[in-house]
Amino acid sequence: MIKGETIKNNSVKIVVATGIGAALFVIIGWLINIPTPIPNTSIQLQYAVLALFSALFGPLAGFLIGFIGHALKDSFLYGAPWWTWVLGSGLMGLFLGFGVKRESLTQGIFGNKEIIRFNIVQFLANVVVWGLIAPIGDILVYSEPANKVFTQGVVAGLVNALTIAVAGTLLLKLYAATRTKSGTLDKE
């Protein structure tokens, strides 16, 4: 295959994955939204799907899915996006895309070592994105009170980390189980 064709095929895959992933992000975020005791903070399963798509299609697709999906979800549900958290979802997708070795995953490899690596990356990403970037953005852009947004950020980071650790890991493990491991087929 010619190098230009590979780039074009990858671009098409990223665009298609972004469209499907963003649509799933919106639909799951709309249908499954479990409130926490902290206002404007909920358990959201779309981050598990974001983890799967980011792992399969890479950091760029992950960023676009998180950013576009969150912007659309906020627009549909609340009338306007909350841009600092929209950026946070995009950054989560970006970081999640670096948490899994795509080649291994597509070859059916997602064992304990890969699970640990993925969960370390996703936990650190949740701490940085929801514990720092989104709250600081809220303070700078929206003049929100620091104690409020840091509380929301810490709670969101913890519930998202738990959601991704359980449901995201499960989705990745199930996906890997559907792949044929290299060298497992014998000629008869």
From Swiss-Prot:
| Annotated Gene Ontology cellular component terms | plasma membrane
Would I find Membrane among this entry's keywords?
Answer: yes
* Protein name, UniProt field: UPF0397 protein LACR_0367
Q: Which residues cross the membrane?
A: 14-34, 48-68, 80-100, 120-140, 152-172
Q: What is its main location?
A: membrane
Which family is this protein grouped under? Belongs to the UPF0397 family.
* UniProt keyword Cell membrane, yes or no: yes
Q: Which InterPro entries does the record associate with it?
A: ECF_substrate-spec-like (IPR009825), UPF0397 (IPR022914)
Q: Which domain of life is it from?
A: Bacteria
Q: How does it sit in the membrane?
A: Multi-pass membrane protein
Q: Which UniProt keywords apply?
A: Cell membrane, Membrane, Transmembrane, Transmembrane helix
- Which NCBIfam families does the UniProt record give? PRK13661.1
Pfam families assigned to the protein according to its UniProt record, in alphabetical order: ECF-ribofla_trS
* Annotated compartments: Cell membrane
